Structure formats: C-alpha cells, structure tokens
Amino acid sequence: MMSKDKNRTNDVLIEAGLLSLVLTGTTLATYRGYTRYLRQIRNARGIPSKVFRKRWLYGKVTAVGDGDNFHFFHMPGGLFGGWGWLRSTPQLEKIDIVKKSRNSKRLLDFFRSSNKYVDLPVQYKNKRRLPTISVRICGVDAPERSHFGNPAQPYSEEALIWLQHEILGKKLWIKPLNIDQYGRCVASIRYWTRFGYKDLSLQMLKEGLALVYEGKSNAEFGGREKIYRRHEFIAKSKRIGMWSQKKLETPGDYKRKL
C-alpha cells in the first residue's frame, strides 16, 4: 500500500514538473514572440541590431518635415498586433482641401513643370510629440529647404509637397539599413499605390525631385544603386522636375557652401 502511494506521489511530482516546464516554455516562447514581432520600436536608437538589413517594419507616417525624411510610428503586427482595436493608432488632423486658385503670375507660369507638384493635395497636418522613428530615405538627396536664414533651393518646396501627398498619414514598410550622423534611421521604403508597391526612393528620382545621394559617409542604397542611377539619368535627359533648370546646384554643393 505504501509503495502504491509513493508511486502516485512520484507520478504527481513528475506531472507537476512537466507542467511547470511546459508553462515555462510557453511563457518564454510567448515573450520571445512578443519581443520579436509585437514590441513597438519607439525611436531610431531603439532598433535592435538584428533588424538592420534583414527585417521590414510596418507603421504609419505621422510627419514629413523635409523632402527626404519623415517620422514613422511603428505598428508591429498591424491589425493582428492589435493596432486599431487593442492598441491606439495616432490620428492626424485633416486639412480642408481647397482647389488652389491661380493668380496672374501663376497663369504666366502655367507650363512650368513645378506647378503639378505645388498643386498636389495634402490631406493631413503633421503630428508631432509621438514615439516615432526618424527616417532618412535611402539613396537619394532632395533639394534643401530654407535653414538658418539661408535661401531654399529650387524645387525644395515641390519635393516636400510631393512627399506629403504620397505618404503623410499613410501606412508603409521600412527596412532599416543604418543610423546616420544625425541619429536618423536610413531605410528603404515600400508603400502601396493603386499600381502596387512602390520604392519611394525610385519614385522620387523618376519625378525629378531628388538625385542619387552624393555623400561618401552613410551612403546606403539597399542594393539598388544601379537602378537609382539609371532612373536619375532618364529624368535628367528628359529634363523632368529639378532637371528642367538651366543651371542646377546639387544639394551636396549647396550644403558645402554653408
């Protein structure tokens, strides 16, 4: 009788031990799954090293401050990660879109290629003070806007408006490649259009609103430098966008003068 009770006690202990192992394993697996797939990255410095060049991050563009950078609110897992029903997503304030009237000067300039960019509708206002990743679009350089009293480059406003029109308030994918000297995440960008997914860097080059990045430090192309240079050449030969100017000062030359 004692032997049977002892065996039963041993069986209970073994079962309890196995259950404990299963629960521990499940907890560890759940934690690893959460940290790998569902934990939000709240700034560029918080991106794990294992993510660079290997993983795409999904999220929403909450602000566009220049022609080649923006703020990205990471939404890991998307709908399945609870965003929009368990976890709140930032809502951007809408802008009342009013058709822009052309004054006499604009009428004289009607055929300037920049008009098609200036007149693009921007639906949302930037939303700041959020836990976002500051993103620098890889492989390209857009014309410089006015900084510290210095004049803006031609087509800098057009590049900004086009970028706001394309991605502000929208969801897209980024692949982190590096962190630049300003603490921004240099990344490849893919965003959805009615024609399918597009490479944001490539689209800017096709529109003539950026040129291939000239800097020697932190030059990142996501493996697409040849494609970028080919489409820069096409835009230049067709005098599209910024290439329509008689004399073009590159963003790199502009910055070297400051």
UniProtKB/Swiss-Prot annotation:
Q: Which residues form a coiled coil?
A: none
Transport: is it a keyword of this entry?
Answer: no
Q: What is its EC number?
A: 3.1.-.-
> Catalytic residues per the record?
136, 144, 184
**InterPro entries given in the database record:** SNase_OB-fold_sf, Staphylococal_nuclease_OB-fold
* Domain TNase-like: start-end pairs: 55-245
SUPFAM superfamilies tied to this protein = Staphylococcal nuclease (SSF50199)
The protein's matches in Pfam families, at most eight in alphabetical order, are given as:
SNase (PF00565)
* Record key words, sorted: Calcium, Endonuclease, Hydrolase, Membrane, Metal-binding, Mitochondrion, Nuclease, Transmembrane, Transmembrane helix
MF terms (GO), sorted A to Z: endonuclease activity; metal ion binding
State if Membrane is listed as a keyword. yes
User: GO cellular component annotations, sorted alphabetically?
Assistant: membrane; mitochondrion
- SMART domains according to UniProt: SNc
Taxonomic superkingdom: Eukaryota
Topology of this chain in the membrane: Single-pass membrane protein
Membrane-crossing residue ranges in chain numbering: 12-34
Query: Which cell locations does it reside in?
Result: Mitochondrion; Membrane
Residues annotated for Ca(2+) binding in this entry: 141
* Family designation: Belongs to the LCL3 family.
**Protein name as catalogued:** Probable endonuclease LCL3
**What species does this protein belong to?**
Nakaseomyces delphensis
Classification of source organism: Eukaryota, Fungi, Dikarya, Ascomycota, Saccharomycotina
